[in-house]
Curated annotation (Swiss-Prot):
Main location: plastid
Gene: rps12
Native source species: Solanum nigrum (Black nightshade)
Family: Belongs to the universal ribosomal protein uS12 family.
Oligomer status and interactors: Part of the 30S ribosomal subunit.
Protein name per the record: Small ribosomal subunit protein uS12c
GO terms of molecular function: rRNA binding; structural constituent of ribosome
């Protein structure tokens, strides 16, 4: 977790990711709660987080080892959640 620039205040969830190309990047984990651990394999997309300096990537939820957000009802496709029955 890292803290955002002024005037915002929070503990934003981020992960250090080693890409297959050998680069080591910092990626943001969107949504509430996550299951990512030290050796999780994740898919990364571009897109910076404006109030987190140096964070230029997002982790894609709902693919590989990153599960979707639990109990999400709206805006589900961005968080890897199937339609509830």
């Amino acid at each position: 977790t890292i803290t955002p620039k002024k005037p915002n205040s929070a503990l934003r969830k981020v992960a250090r990711v080693r890409l297959t190309s050998g680069f080591e990047i910092t990626a943001y984990i969107p949504g509430i709660g996550h299951n990512s651990q030290e050796h999780s394999v994740v898919l990364v997309r571009g897109g910076r987080v404006k109030d987190l300096p140096g964070v230029r990537y997002h982790i894609v939820r709902g693919t590989l080892d990153a599960v979707g957000v639990k109990d999400r009802q709206q805006g589900r496709s961005k968080y890897g959640v199937k339609k509830p029955k």
